[in-house]
């Protein structure tokens, strides 16, 4: 097969995985990498929409039907645990030696967790709770004896901008009892290869493309806090290292913001789509550097019917305004780096000025809200039927999420409720 124009390199020089593959059709890239991995028992996990598409047929034909041992189609948003276990059982029965995913963050997260559970012979949610208690954010890295590393190779082919394909984190929701979303981190959950094909994403509905784009914006924006740097970032954590991280976050955020607008103007612009996809490779660096209540509150909105990316559209501007109003000088200086990205770019500046904003009287929440509005995305909980009566339960769940607990402005249940009222 011709590999002219194929690009293949590490996503990030600081980690051995994943590698990025792009420049040729995804099905050709997957077949090439499957052969290089000497895989003969390939398992495909596809989103519900892609499971009915020509794209899946193209992938199967390229791989050779004889090498495909199973399929799992349609993991719901926010990744229900029952679907993770359904996938886990299938992986065991088929003895897959390679997994290929087609879809967004829920599919990617489901495979991450199933791979890790498979390596540790987990069969029940109770066993998973015990194992995964060692893999929660902020905890020391567990030994390989405590948590066996995931071992089945995986190729992710993303069709949204969630950025999950580049991270070692995953989340799943208990839909049978408390409806809480649990976040897990383990080094072995990195993908082996991420295949990027902007043409494949043309079939992704605009709502999902732009909302997951804002989710990626959320990763970069909260990553600027630096509140997780001492526990999560690999490096010397010196002041100079932190400055480099901040510059990288600003550069990737700016590239993503501008390219998203190009897609808004021209849906078929595959060059802009590829720029967005490539910008996401720095999401792990941002997420390991900082996180906050937009993620923590957002994790708890899934069971109420809010899509993964749409949680950021609604909550991120409100959390930013709260943190700006209640933060100290150091935090304000960090948040100013976000507004600098907007006011330092001619395209983004025009967007803000056209909406009546000016540098001297805007905060980070204002500029992010204006940008989300320009993309035509939802901006209130009421649009999802979430009202005051549910705020206290959401806030209670959010306060058990580590992302809320480490927000740079200390929060409690009542303060989270205040943020929810801002998003009402």
Curated annotation (Swiss-Prot):
Q: Write down any Gene Ontology CC term.
A: mitochondrion
Going by the UniProt record, its keywords in alphabetical order are: Iron, NAD, Oxidoreductase
Q: What happens in the null mutant? A: Impairs the production of fumonisins but accumaulates the intermediate tetradehydro-fumonisin B1.
Task: Report the protein's function.
Answer: Dehydrogenase; part of the gene cluster that mediates the biosynthesis of fumonisins B1 (FB1), B2 (FB2), B3 (FB3), and B4 (FB4), which are carcinogenic mycotoxins. Within the pathway, FUM7 is involved the addition of the tricarballylic moieties to the carbon backbone.
Which E.C. number(s) belong to this protein? 1.14.11.-
Matching entries from InterPro entries are given as: ADH_Fe/GldA, ADH_Fe_C, Alcohol_dehydrogenase_Fe
Required co-factor(s) are: Fe cation
Q: Which CDD domains match?
A: MAR-like
Pathway in which this enzyme or protein is active: Mycotoxin biosynthesis
Q: Which organism was this protein described from? A: Gibberella moniliformis (strain M3125 / FGSC 7600)
Which PANTHER family does the entry mention?
ALCOHOL DEHYDROGENASE, ALCOHOL DEHYDROGENASE, PUTATIVE (AFU_ORTHOLOGUE AFUA_1G06800)-RELATED
What induces or represses its expression, per the UniProt entry? Expression correlates with fuminisins production.
Record-level Gene Ontology MF annotations: alcohol dehydrogenase (NAD+) activity; metal ion binding
Q: What name is this protein filed under? A: Dehydrogenase FUM7
Record's keyword annotation contains Repeat: no
Q: Name one GO biological process term.
A: fumonisin biosynthetic process
Enzyme class name: oxidoreductase
Q: Where is the signal peptide?
A: none
| Family that this chain belongs to | Belongs to the iron-containing alcohol dehydrogenase family.
Q: Which domain of life is it from?
A: Eukaryota
